Amino acid sequence: MRLSKAQYDEIALFISTLRPTRQCMKRLKERFPCQSQSTLLSIFSQEYQKMIKRTHAKHHTPEAVEMYYARYLNEVARDPKVPILLELANEVDFSPALMARTVLERFLQDHDGQPPTKPVLSSMLRDPSLIPDPVLANQVHLCIINDCFNGPLVDGIKHAIGHEHEVLLRQKLKEHNLAFLDEDQLRLKGYDKTPDVILEVPVAVDGHVIHWIESKASFGDEASHKTYLHDQFWSYWNRFGPGLVIYWYGFIEDLDCNRERGILLKDGFPETLVMLGSCMAQTDEHGQHTKNCLNETHQETES
């Protein structure tokens, strides 16, 4: 789903008025009924992550950490069954999973006499039963399962969704008899940074030849797309030539501005492909990657 910048800004502005609860998605869908649930959820998640980054520092000052830890100890001494950390996170407008991480790290510093390593901390957040204090273990568990946008549970879901769309991309390519190499095959060939697939025979999409396809199970907003361009897409272009990025949950239409330079954006598998029967790589006078292609055949794809 392609959105104009004005449409995206309207959604982002409304999101800024919502708290990150399960009920917020119902309100968001009611406000923007024409947008898909997946698109709205992806945009909400991205906007929430931006807010977390903006406010991260104030929640991690020594004073804030000591205040959160003292509040936890005082409240849990009164009634260990009350979800203290979850309530505290909501009170100070902080991610429950990050609140749990902050207090757990402070607890382990007292318990072990030194700050925990990141692997130890991460393993306890993934499996709270590893936490030596059963009361804190339960408090951390409640934070993890009630955080809709952060934490190991959410990370696992995002990873699964990303993998699901990579599988979908490979299925689509196989349905259209397009030979390709995936990331695992490319790593075996010694490539360290690769797109999800490289086409063994390039195809044309909307009149542009592509050699690779990258799958993104997210919405393409300005911040994420700028980062991907810098960290991934231009590197792929330099190494493999022009390519296609699929933002399965849509993108801001103004971002599709690098087609002539060799990076196309789509919100799904292309509806029409031009199969290139015989291609010879060329480089034009400006150093741009081009293809001289013969024996073209058109293939319509199913939506």
From Swiss-Prot:
The entry's keywords: Cytoplasm, Nucleus
Gene Ontology cellular component list: cytoplasm; nucleus
Main location: nucleus
Superkingdom of the organism of origin: Eukaryota
Claim: Ribosomal protein is one of the keywords in the record: no
Annotated InterPro entries: CDIN1
Cytoplasm in keyword set: yes
GO biological-process terms attached to the record: erythrocyte differentiation
Location in or out of the cell: Nucleus; Cytoplasm
Signal peptide: none
Function: May play a role in erythroid cell differentiation.
PANTHER family: CDAN1-INTERACTING NUCLEASE 1 (PTHR31661:SF1), SIMILAR TO CDNA SEQUENCE BC052040 (PTHR31661)
The protein's name in its UniProt record: CDAN1-interacting nuclease 1
